[in-house]
A protein has these predicted regions:
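Hydrophobic alpha-helical segments, chiefly the membrane-spanning helices
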Residues: 267-272
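Short loop/edge segments at beta-strand edges and connector loops
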Residues: 75, 117, 183
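Conserved small/polar residues in nucleotide/adenosyl-binding loops
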Residues: 256-263
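Internal alpha-helical scaffold of NAD(P)-dependent oxidoreductase catalytic cores
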Residues: 27, 133, 154-185, 197-226
Length: 272
């Protein structure tokens, strides 16, 4: 199966990043969001990234012009998914919202299109099972910033077809990502491990174990992490981390209990 047209639903940080790399690959890419202000912000995010690349000599103006031709911005979901080979949902981590979108996608997307969710923690089965085509639905978890981070976590559920898995792996390869394949368990492989580290770092900060800067430095120099857990929590967004923690707490109890509001505020302390 070839990739010619991709639709990305949700123009936030993740959605705009996914749309950007698809356009750079040469695929006709449609970025869709129901809120015009969100769509405009997504457009600005992409423009800003490309302009930075030009200033640093990593991108040319000609490349930007070519990539821009591959991008279309839509408010209407039906228009966005028309003729798409792949639809990637990247809306906030709210299960009912994702279910609603996939119910719509089953109706309006091409019947041979692969339908992916970029969720970082929500069960793929819980999304797929609201449709009558679960075999076409898969998790494709990208990482922020999408154009830079090399990992793509592919999440298969029990009803996912081998064809769908192979297609997702092919897309990852074409986009220059290193793919891992994991089972549909709470938090998958990355969030299940990652939020524990971030959660504990926030607790350590609130207990006065060390400063934010020193906690981050401990992991960067002691374990070769490119970014400290508190820095990463701020980059991902404490609201996103909270949603992931709340989701995982239902399955793993105290290990993933969200820190208190006071602890969260402290995590925003300068890292340097």
């Amino acid at each position: 199966m070839q990739v010619h047209t991709v639709a990305v639903v949700g123009a936030g940080t993740m959605g705009s990043g996914i749309a950007q790399i698809c356009a750079q690959k040469g695929w006709q890419t449609r970025l869709c969001d129901a809120f015009p202000e969100s769509l405009e912000k997504g457009m600005e995010n992409i423009e800003r990234f490309w302009d930075k690349g030009i200033k640093k000599g990593k991108t040319t103006k000609q490349e930007k012009e070519e990539w821009s031709k591959n991008l279309q911005f839509c408010i209407d979901l039906t228009e966005a998914v028309d003729g798409a080979d792949l639809v990637i949902e990247a809306v906030p981590e709210i299960l009912e919202l994702k279910k609603e979108i996939f119910i719509q996608l089953e109706e309006i997307a091409p019947k041979n299109a692969i339908l992916a969710t970029n969720t970082s923690s929500i069960s793929i089965s819980s999304i797929a099972n609201v449709t009558s085509c679960p075999e076409r639905i898969i998790g494709m978890h990208f990482f922020n910033p999408v154009p830079i981070m090399k990992l793509l976590e592919i999440v298969k559920h029990e009803k996912c077809s081998e064809k769908t898995i192979s297609f997702a792996e092919l897309v990852g390869e074409k986009l220059g990502k290193e793919t891992i394949l994991v089972k549909d368990i709470p938090g998958f492989a990355t969030s299940r491990l990652g939020v524990v580290l971030g959660n504990e770092a926030i607790r350590m900060l609130s207990e006065g174990v060390a400063s934010a800067s020193d906690i981050d430095t401990a992991m960067k120099l002691g374990y070769k992490h490119p970014m400290g857990p508190l820095e990463l929590s701020d980059l991902v967004g404490l609201d996103v981390r909270r949603d992931i923690l709340n989701s995982l707490a239902e399955s793993f109890c105290l290990l993933y209990t969200s820190p208190s509001p006071r602890d969260k505020r402290q995590s925003r302390m300068p890292s340097s």
